C-alpha cells in the first residue's frame, strides 16, 4: 500500500524525472482537501454499524430468499458472517478514502474475494447489491453538509464512490 505521495515519488523515480508541476499541484489539492477527507472518513467510521445494518435490511427486503430457509444468510451464524463481510468491505473502503489510494482495498480485501464467495456458493450479485446499498448509505452521510468542513465535496464523494464500485465489481 502506498500513499499518494509515495506513489508520485515512485512513479517519478521510475521515469528518472523530477516530480512534475502537475503532480505537485494534484498533491497540493489533495492536502488542501484533507480536512474534508478526514471528515468523510470519520463520518463513515462513526456510522459504520448503521450503514451496514441499513444496507443489510434493504438487501434482505429486496432479496428475501437470502434469509429464507436454505438461503445464504439463513441462520444467525450465516447472517453474522454476511454482516461481518459487509463491515470488512466498508472498513477497507474507509482506508482507501483515508489514503486516497485503492491499493489497500484491492490487495487486502478484494484480492481473491470473488473466488472465496464462489467456493462458498454465495451469490456474488447479492454481495455486489449489498456493497452498492452501503455506498448509497455512506455517500448520503458524507454528503450531509451539517458539521462538515466548508467546500465542495463532489470530487471526494465521487472518489469514495469508486472504491465501493471496485468492491461491487470484484464480487459480481
From Swiss-Prot:
Modification after translation is described as:
Contains two covalently linked bilin chromophores.
How is this protein positioned relative to the membrane? Peripheral membrane protein
Residues annotated as binding (2R,3E)-phycoerythrobilin are: 153
The family database entries (InterPro entries) matched by this protein are listed as:
Globin-like_sf, Phycobilisome_asu/bsu, Phycobilisome_asu/bsu_sf, Phycocyanin_b
Q: Which positions bind (2R,3E)-phycocyanobilin? A: 82
The entry's cellular-component GO terms read:
phycobilisome; plasma membrane-derived thylakoid membrane
GO annotation (BP), single: photosynthesis
Where is this protein localized, as stated in its record? Answer: Cellular thylakoid membrane
Q: State the UniProt keywords alphabetically.
A: Antenna complex, Bile pigment, Chromophore, Electron transport, Membrane, Methylation, Photosynthesis, Phycobilisome, Thylakoid, Transport
N4-methylasparagine PTM positions read 72
NCBIfam families attached here?
Answer: phycocy_beta (TIGR01339)
Quaternary state and interactors? Heterodimer of an alpha and a beta chain.
Described purpose of this protein according to its UniProt entry: Light-harvesting photosynthetic bile pigment-protein from the phycobiliprotein complex.
Regarding protein family, the annotation reads: Belongs to the phycobiliprotein family.
- What this protein is called in its record is R-phycocyanin-2 beta chain
Query: Gene name on record?
Result: rpcB
Amino acid at each position: 500500500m502506498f500513499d499518494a505521495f509515495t506513489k508520485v515519488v515512485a512513479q517519478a523515480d521510475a521515469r528518472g524525472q523530477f516530480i512534475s508541476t502537475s503532480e505537485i499541484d494534484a498533491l497540493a489539492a489533495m492536502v488542501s482537501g484533507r480536512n474534508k477527507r478526514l471528515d468523510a472518513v470519520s463520518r463513515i467510521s462513526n456510522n459504520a454499524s448503521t450503514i451496514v445494518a441499513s444496507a443489510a435490511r434493504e438487501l434482505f427486503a429486496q432479496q428475501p430468499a437470502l434469509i429464507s430457509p436454505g438461503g445464504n444468510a439463513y441462520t444467525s451464524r450465516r447472517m453474522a458472517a454476511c454482516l461481518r463481510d459487509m463491515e470488512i468491505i466498508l472498513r477497507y473502503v474507509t482506508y482507501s478514502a483515508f489514503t486516497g489510494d485503492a491499493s489497500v482495498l484491492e490487495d487486502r480485501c478484494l484480492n481473491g474475494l470473488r473466488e472465496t464467495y464462489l467456493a462458498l456458493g454465495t451469490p456474488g450479485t447479492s454481495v455486489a447489491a449489498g456493497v452498492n446499498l452501503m455506498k448509497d448509505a455512506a455517500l448520503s452521510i458524507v454528503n450531509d453538509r451539517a458539521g462538515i468542513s466548508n467546500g465542495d465535496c463532489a470530487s471526494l464523494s465521487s472518489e469514495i464512490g469508486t472504491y465501493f464500485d471496485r468492491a461491487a465489481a470484484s464480487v459480481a
